[in-house]
């Protein structure tokens, strides 16, 4: 009816139980159309028999494991939605998620869209630092050095690649 080519629609599995998180590899490999996966919140907490809290400490292990599994599988992890109403707490959780390595987060409350968008969009300061990192590393390599020093941090290939990824992400988001 809508004339989508066969296989064009991606599948985004939701890991909302302990079994879902533990079996993510099998779920993700079930179809080449799985390019990302979403971690659940409330169903997962209930399945774990965890006491829900605003800081989501009870989901920390599952969040980390889910992220690790997704990255190992080459699929994009989508962090669990923040299901409490407080915007400041939502921002704190989103910042923790981004620090862990998530690049996106599910939303269930309309008021949280702008908060999450702001957290996951690279700032001009972050972009300037990434540009400085890339430039310094490339200059060091051109001089035959294996790393560069930027603001007290030795820049080696992993940090350089993360800076390049951040710049690419900003380009994709049209903020670079």
Give residue spans per PLM region.
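Expand to "…catalyze enediolate/carbanion chemistry for C-C bond making/breaking, isomerization
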Residues: 1-176
């Amino acid at each position: 009816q809508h004339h989508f080519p066969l296989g064009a629609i991606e599948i985004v599995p939701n890991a909302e139980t302990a079994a879902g998180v533990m079996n993510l590899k099998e779920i993700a490999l079930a179809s080449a159309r799985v390019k990302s996966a979403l971690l659940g919140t409330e169903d997962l907490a209930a399945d774990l028999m965890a006491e829900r809290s605003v800081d989501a400490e009870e989901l920390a292990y599952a969040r980390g494991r889910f992220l690790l599994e997704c990255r190992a599988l080459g699929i994009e992890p989508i962090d669990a939605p923040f299901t409490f109403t407080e915007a400041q707490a939502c921002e704190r959780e989103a910042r923790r998620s981004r620090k862990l390595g998530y690049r996106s987060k599910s939303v269930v409350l309309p008021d949280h869209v702008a908060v999450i968008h702001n957290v996951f969009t690279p700032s001009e300061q972050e972009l300037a630092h990434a540009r400085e990192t890339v430039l310094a590393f490339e200059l060091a390599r051109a001089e035959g050095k294996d790393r560069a020093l930027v603001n007290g941090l030795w820049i080696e290939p992993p940090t350089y690649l993360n800076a390049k990824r951040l710049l690419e992400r900003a380009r994709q988001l049209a903020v670079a």
